[in-house]
């Protein structure tokens, strides 16, 4: 709620700094805290309302930090890289219940990925994506182990369009051979399913989108572009170079905390 309030003012938590952001959180608590407690009471929750605490109170914060530190040193928890819902406006993670799917003007692009060396007359595979800009971070193409159409290609490689990087073709049960073309581009850094598949096959993780939604240094000539501008540029380049096949409309997730 505080992030949304700041966004309505055209600012972000990063611009005002940690201390100022916490002050805004306290203001929000002063404004809505009583209402929230009354709602909890209205639901019949049996609590000791004489001993209320705010999660940003210094003592509370210290206790949480100590607990997590202790758990880390006791190997109860660990810190690792995982895919999460992310808002580039707030530059914060988004809970699953704060992400919603809206049917807007999104597309599903079908792209040609040329084989490094033609096999039995086949020169390319066709993959589909709703986010062409993520192809800059592709590190593999997966097929179903039982798919006879592509079994002879497992172990071969394709050349990633625009990037000219060789990436492997491999088999994984995650692929539904009845859906789409039966070939799935793998971008472990930008898709939760791809990330899990990547762990199983030791795929390289190449992140191409920064926290603020712009393409990073791994994006080559697209470095610094907003992801949507990059999408347009990549689609244009793919079409001009003969790699674009088809496109369809598809829904996309959006952070419902953001009104823009």
Locate predicted features.
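N-terminal Rossmann-like or analogous alpha/beta NTP/dinucleotide-binding catalytic cores
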Residues: 1-69, 73, 197, 224-242
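NTP-handling and nucleic-acid-processing catalytic cores
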Residues: 42, 46-47, 53, 57-212, ...
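Acidic/polar loop patches that form or flank catalytic/metal-binding clefts of enzymes
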Residues: 78-81, 243-247
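Short acidic beta-strand-loop surface patches of small beta-rich interaction domains
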Residues: 214-218
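Catalytic palm subdomain of template-directed nucleic-acid polymerases
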Residues: 219-223
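Conserved small/polar residues in nucleotide/adenosyl-binding loops
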Residues: 248-255
């Amino acid at each position: 709620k505080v992030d949304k309030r700041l966004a309505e003012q055209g600012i972000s938590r990063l611009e005002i700094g940690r201390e100022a952001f916490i002050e805004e959180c306290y203001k929000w608590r002063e404004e809505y805290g009583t209402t929230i407690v009354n709602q909890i009471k209205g639901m019949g929750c049996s609590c000791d309302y004489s001993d209320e605490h705010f999660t940003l109170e210094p003592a509370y914060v210290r206790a949480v930090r100590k607990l997590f530190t202790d758990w880390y040193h006791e190997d109860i928890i660990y810190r690792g890289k995982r895919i999460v819902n992310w808002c580039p406006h707030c530059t914060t993670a988004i809970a699953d219940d704060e992400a919603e799917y809206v049917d807007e003007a999104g597309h599903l692009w079908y792209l040609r990925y040329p084989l490094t060396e033609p096999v039995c007359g086949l020169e390319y595979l066709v993959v589909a994506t709703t986010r062409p800009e993520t192809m800059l971070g592709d590190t593999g193409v997966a097929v179903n182990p039982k798919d006879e159409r592509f079994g002879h290609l497992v172990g071969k490689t394709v050349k990633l369009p625009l990037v000219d990087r060789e990436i492997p073709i491999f088999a994984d049960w995650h692929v539904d051979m009845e859906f789409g073309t039966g070939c799935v581009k793998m971008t472990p850094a930008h898709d939760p399913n791809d990330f899990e598949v990547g762990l199983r096959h030791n795929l390289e993780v190449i992140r191409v989108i920064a926290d603020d939604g712009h393409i990073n240094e791994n994006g080559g000539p697209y470095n610094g572009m907003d992801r949507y501008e990059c999408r347009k540029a990549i689609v244009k380049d793919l079409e001009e170079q003969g790699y674009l096949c088809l496109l369809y409309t598809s829904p996309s997730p959006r952070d419902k905390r953001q009104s823009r």
